Structure formats: structure tokens, C-alpha cells
Amino acid sequence: MKRLFSFIIASAATLTAAAQMHLSVELNNNHLWRGIEVADGCVVETDLNYTFAKGHMTLGLWGGTNTQGTYKEFNHYLSIQGAGFKFSAWDTYNFSPDATYNNRQYFNYSAHETGRFLNCTLDYRFQQPQFPLLLSWSTIMFGRDRSADNTAQKYSTFVYAEYPVYKKDGWQVDAGVGGAFALNKAGDDHHFYGTTPGIVHTQLKVSRDLKIGSYTLPVHVMGMWNPQSDKAFFQVGAQIIKL
């Protein structure tokens, strides 16, 4: 018993020693997500997280808002990663003032009434340096992803592939494509990202770290196209804080 207790204490001490707090803040001209322009204007996105279990697990809080006050979002998330795999669960709550769903009850988790949704994602990044392809499967498991009559969960799913097509002299260019569909049609083909199954997101993102004296400023520009909605968006952003 004494040995077991000592082992538990030693394990806890090891995990604690490896644990780290992280804070990052990004400034973008809009907020883009899976073929959707969630918000426009000057958007501030903040991520505060705690990494433990030797870097394999992360608990985090994510918030976003724009300077006009028309966009407000506050999320919680958990991620587990190792050997190229990463599982994440995001409890997402966008309570923007003009929302057409329940944006007034933060703690309402009733499936028929809630304004939030739970998005679960499994990623895999190939570990070969010569083939760093990223594959991703995301399904909304709960929340405001309902049938037209609000009697069933649609389980809208987004599948995505991304590949770094260029990486040289500090520049990186990532190309990605994503499609969406509902696992449960529940009367029709509409899903969280569109009206029918199909491609809803293509992107080309160019990133580079700018050196300003001793300060490093990661910047990016991204073009995003949604063939299903016949829309396109352009984003410019920078990570202004990374701790």
C-alpha cells in the first residue's frame, strides 16, 4: 500500500511538472470556419489552455469577439493527442446579439432549446516528413444541429484534408478541401454547413513569421471558397500574443 501511494504521488508530480499554461491572441479581419464567415470586421480570438499528461492532454477556453460588438463566442474544449492522432471535443456557444437561436441561456443543455453545440473531431497527421497529409472527421454530436421540426439530431459531419504544398525560406502554403453531410437526414438533406451533401470549404493559406527586433509575429493570409453557397472570403491575420 505504501509503495502504491508513493507511485501515485510520484506520477502526479511528474504530470504536474510537465503541465504548462498557454495563452495566445490573434487579430483577424474576420472569423472563418468550415466554409462560413462567422463574423466580419476586426475580430479578436483568444485561446487559454492548460496542457498536461506530458503534452498529450489539453483543457482550454476559447473566446472570440469583434470590435462592432455583433459577434460574441465562448467555448470550452478538451483534446487528447499522440502518435499522429488527435481527438478533440468543443462545447461551442456563439451568443451574438442577432443570433436566430437561443443566445440568452448559457447553461441550457436541453437538446430542443440549447443555443450551443458539441463538435467532436478526430484528426490524423501522417508522420512521414515527405508526406505530412492531415485528415479530419468532425461530427456535431449534440445541440443546435436539429431537423426542421426539432425532433431529431442531424449529426452534421465535416470531413477535411489539408496538405502543405510549399514550405521554404520561412514561407508555408497549406491547401485544404472539406465536404459536409448529415449522418441523419431526418426528412431532408440539409446540414449545419449547407443544404445538400457536398464540398463546402476549400482554402489556400500562406503563413510566415515576421521578425521585428527580438519579437516574432506570425502572420497569414487565407482565401476560402464555398462552392455550395457560391461565396468566397479573404482573411488577413496575425498572432499578436503567444505565451
Predicted regions and their residues:
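Outer-membrane beta-barrel "beta-signal"
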Residues: L204, D230-L243
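Outer membrane beta-barrel transmembrane domains
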Residues: Q172-K211, H220
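Transmembrane beta-strand segments that form the barrel wall of outer-membrane beta-barrel proteins
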Residues: V25-H31, H56-T67, F87-F95, N102-Y106, ...
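Residue-level signature of outer-membrane beta-barrel architecture
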Residues: Y50-F52, I80-G82, D91, Y124-Q128, ...
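Outer-membrane pore/translocation modules
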Residues: Q68-Y160, D189-P197, Q235
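Short loop/turn motifs that connect adjacent beta-strands in outer-membrane beta-barrel proteins
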Residues: A19-Q20, A53-T58, S88, Q127-L133, ...
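Outer-membrane beta-barrel initiation region
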Residues: Q20-T51
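Cleavable N-terminal export/targeting peptides
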Residues: M1-H22
